[in-house]
Amino acid sequence: MNRKVFSFASILLLTFIHLSYTLAQVSATPEKEENSVRIMTYNVRNACDINGVASYQQVADIIHQANPDVVAVQELDSATQRARGVDVLAELGERTMMFTTFVSLYDYQKGKHGLGILSKERPIRHWMVYLPGKDQARGALFAEFKDYIICCTQLSKIQEEQNASVLVIFDAIKDIKKPVFLAGDMNCSYESASQNALQSKFTTLNDFKQATIPVINEPNIPTACIDFIYGYSANYKYAVLARQVISLREFDHYPVFVDVRISSPVDRIFRTKPYLQKPIDNGITISWLTNVPVHSWVEYGKNGNLDQKKQLYVDGQMLCNNKTHHFRLENLEPGVTYSYRVCSREITLYQAYKKEFGYTAYSDIYTFTLPSTGTSDFTALVFNDVHKNFDLMEKFARLIKEKDLKYDFVFYNGDVIDDPKDQDQAVGFMKVLNEIAIAEKAPVFYMRGNHEIRNAYSIGLRSLFDYINGTTYGAFSWGDTRFVMLDCGEDKSDSTWVYYGLNDFNQLRDDQAAFLKKELAGKEFKKATKKILIHHIPIYGNREGGYNPCLEKWGDILADAPFDIAINGHTHRFAYHPKGSAGNNFPVVVGGGPRIEGAYMLVLQKKGKQLIFRALDVEGNEKLKLEL
């Protein structure tokens, strides 16, 4: 009796040790990188070990811990006597919490035998093509997902049928536009004729030098690698980030997986068009975003040429493998029209000693012109408090087109990209704003309102913009006109409970007080023939006794400041305060709000020495006109 107990305990201990070793090996798999897919192929032989004992949970644990996105599964019984009525793929799907796709190749023992796919994502559709197979029916199961298609197969063991199967697979994929992965038990080695044929259209992704079966099972295949994962290379490139074979000696085949980054099609590399910013000091910033990490540059030149190239180096190293791009072109000639385009080459693999690249995207060719010092004419548009109202901006876009309004640059004066939750939301609306402004040709100035300060991505907004001097306030000259832009911060005190002690706008206002003093005393400001002040929250004309820290901090400085006009927003109510009517030393205009019936596009137009201000509603009706 004791001998039996000892024997049973020994078996349990050995089983536990082996299982622990197996799971430890799986748990050592690398974390999947961003923008990659983990593909596994696994001939599970009905989830039975080498002795034919069903091991559903062990197989499921191996798959679950490897955490693949999709698994090509071969040798599956469904409700056969051999499987004791169990639908093997359904059992594995339930235990791994993955979607299942099964096709039957032939009837067997009152059930079915076939191929399957496990996937985290529900397939859009699936289909099967039959392959040559005299010994038993063979086939290829295709499943389409959002970004790729996977084909699961198990080829015949007969070489002639393997070769013929390759041609059938080629025919099945010839019209597919998405990336295609082929995965399965090929029943042949890497050096075989069928493998050579496959490699004419497919890239082998797993390491063919690693055994995928116990060598003893196939003594005629010295490399013992017969399970493969491939990528169809007609329209895509594949970077292998990781690959692994999980050795399980008690099973007929080892699970194999690869982490792959699929190259993006050229038309999906750019996330935004280029947009122009900071047209100051004989330079301009060209910004854009990409969907994938890239190596970027700008091609530009005069007279329609693109004979100059700008790349970015930081401390001697190329600034690349990123998605947000700000290229500063400097030492440009004022008054000269430049052509440019932006270029981004996808980086699919960036390792210490190895780099791989996808395709290169080129934007259309655009133009810009920086003003000369003596430029006296310009037209600028100002929008405020849009609050992500797409319909409103579309109406203004139509108005601009109908009036054939030519302009040089655009201000978005706060509460435009309001309460940004994340980058996707912020960039999504920024794209709309850039489209309205035609920002690839006309520079845009994104100014901060109180709502740009709120929500999780508020601090992230600055990654999208190239602020003058790196601050959300500043000044610049357009020809003989000086623009001064201020940031009023929040509309409540820093101690307000909803800010949780995370704001210090008092300091920001103090910093701007010092900036204002220096700016008003500066040569550029004094020599300008026209001077324009822009900020989001009004300082003048507010409710008496209301919170107005900017007036406290800046009021004395602005009391005698010779601005020709100040343009504000924030209140959602259009207002005009003539000079001196509210303690203001210059005319003040407050733009409207996000509702179509109360929204206005503000137009500043300078011709020679005359500066004209107009406020237009969405129909083009003039709310106010000032000759300044």
Predicted regions and their residues:
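Metal-dependent phosphoester-hydrolase catalytic domains
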Residues: 25-29, 128-129, 159, 173-181, ...
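N-terminal, active-site-proximal structural segment of metallo-dependent hydrolase catalytic domains
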Residues: 2, 21-95, 107-108, 261-264, ...
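Structured beta-strand-rich core segments of catalytic domains in phosphoester-bond hydrolases
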Residues: 51-52, 76-149, 244-246, 319
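Conserved beta-sheet core of the metallophosphoesterase superfamily
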Residues: 195-222, 226, 325, 543-609
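Short, surface-exposed linear motifs at loops/turns and structural transition points
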Residues: 266-371
